[in-house]
UniProtKB/Swiss-Prot annotation:
The chain crosses the membrane at residues 7-27, 49-69, 88-108, 121-141, 264-284, 301-321. It is found in: Membrane. Glycans are attached at N193. The keyword Electron transport does not apply. This is Transmembrane protein 236. Keywords: Glycoprotein, Membrane, Transmembrane, Transmembrane helix. Residues 177-216 are annotated as: Disordered. GO terms for cellular component: membrane. Belongs to the TMEM236 family. It comes from Homo sapiens.
Amino acid sequence: MASGRLIKFVVFELLEFAAFSIPTLVITEQFATAYQGTRARSDNTHYWLIISCSIAYVALVTLLIWVPVKVILHKKRYIYRKIKGWRPVLMMCVVLTTLPCLTFSIAVTEVQKSINGSADVLPDMLPDLPVSLVLLSLIMVDIIEKLRIYPLRGSQKSSENGHIHSTSLQHIKTVTEQVRQSPENAASPQATNSTQVSQPSGAMTRSQESVFMGPQEPSCDSGILRMMSRRDVRAELFLWSFLLWSDTIEMVRVAGHPNVYKSSWLYPVYIFSFISLLRITFTPQNPLLNSLSVLLQDLPFVFVRLGLIIALGTITPVLGLCKNILVTLSYIYFNYLTRIRIFSAFEMSPF
């Protein structure tokens, strides 16, 4: 009987291969259907030629790239351990699947324009299934790669408290509290007093003031609250993987708006959406990921969304534009401007 580890490995590999191959076949079938409209309806030669070429492409990249890389990563573990900061499987999916699919999506629109002779007679909306399938496949491969290190049975508690990291202000204590809680200072008060510098009474009063500790979290130790407060890191992988790409998903959906895909705005939307997807090739704990998220997604999306709103109106949410602006400005301010002298003074007050 096959072990659970072997079954997990086989299922994961089949799902990844399906996510690698199916989007290309679906997008090229859509392109073949659009191209067939330029030919005689009784002649299906070009349709089946495009379909056969797409099948040949998938088979070729599978045999020459996908399978050899997978075998090397599985058999030669020392090579896999030498790869730092990026994920080969996601790189193959982005380059060999996502890039051709987005290219064929643009080609479908151009073919439909050439058929009708004008962009005004194009369909009201582009089909949502092909592009959504491309993004869904990429996100699923990302989730599978993250799930590999976890067992699928048993409980795995989350090590993070709601992704809310404690700030340094929440752990600062006053000088008098530290002296009171220190056993060495309690054992030798004379030595402590001899090394301290005398301070004015006003300064001592200010130092004894409590610092902002943040709101207290509720205790859910019994009853239905305990059941509702359960958290598993594997379930959170699905949640945060989709939330991480919600901005790119919304941007790609904008491309289906008639005012976008009937104009030249389709190109920058797809190009910068693909650039933002390059972040998925990096490991989740890569120290450069925060910088790359701003440089590859939020900063370019500021200009794309601003241009769309100015040229075509609010076809993209203003909230998305505000999010990109605030994320970019906060990253620059807290990581770089706070190192300048005028912004580097430590603020003790919570208000």
